[in-house]
């Protein structure tokens, strides 16, 4: 099973914290955001991850690579728990990279991975969004297998918040599953077709 993780954005909403480091590498507790995303993919059976990066994102590649010097230092220091944690990062999945040479948006970032996934179904996980539950990707896969086509994860938001998200219009075909008829990006509160917001899992 394959996944594409777009991580090429400039992170301007998080300035100045992202001036010199990728937003995907901002820490949440003791791990960078993107590690949670790759862990979520791996927990859903993904073994092949393509991360779409851009200029200034080398830290992402270094994070998922082995660090022999660090591992040796931890081993000499008998920091067994930290050694295990550091080694586990590079064993989460086979991680590949492709660079989006110019910022052309999310759709283009996913398209950069087209030759990698070929004609197989694949997941897309935004590299700066943490999903608190691990059942999202299995549910997306289940809906895809039963209905075919592309599947997007949505979550209800407060009506006053719809202008911050892409929102779907559609008909509910079974509890929790909608056939999407339209996507509206950041609608005005009074023009939103629903309160079901897209949150970065496809």
Question: Where are the predicted features?
Answer:
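Conserved beta-strand segments of alpha/beta enzyme cores
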Residues: 24, 94-96, 179
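Structural signal for conserved beta-strand scaffold positions within catalytic alpha/beta enzyme cores
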Residues: 27, 97-99, 152, 182-185
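N-terminal glycine-rich phosphate-binding loop and ensuing alpha1 helix
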Residues: 1-79, 100, 116, 136
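Conserved beta-loop-beta/alpha segment of the NTase-like Rossmann-fold superfamily
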Residues: 62, 69-75, 80-172
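Short loop/turn motifs at secondary-structure junctions
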Residues: 45-46, 118, 146, 179
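Catalytic-core segments of class I nucleotidyltransferases/pyrophosphorylases
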Residues: 123, 141, 145, 172-202
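Well-ordered alpha-helical segments embedded in enzymatic catalytic cores
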Residues: 33-36, 108-112, 182
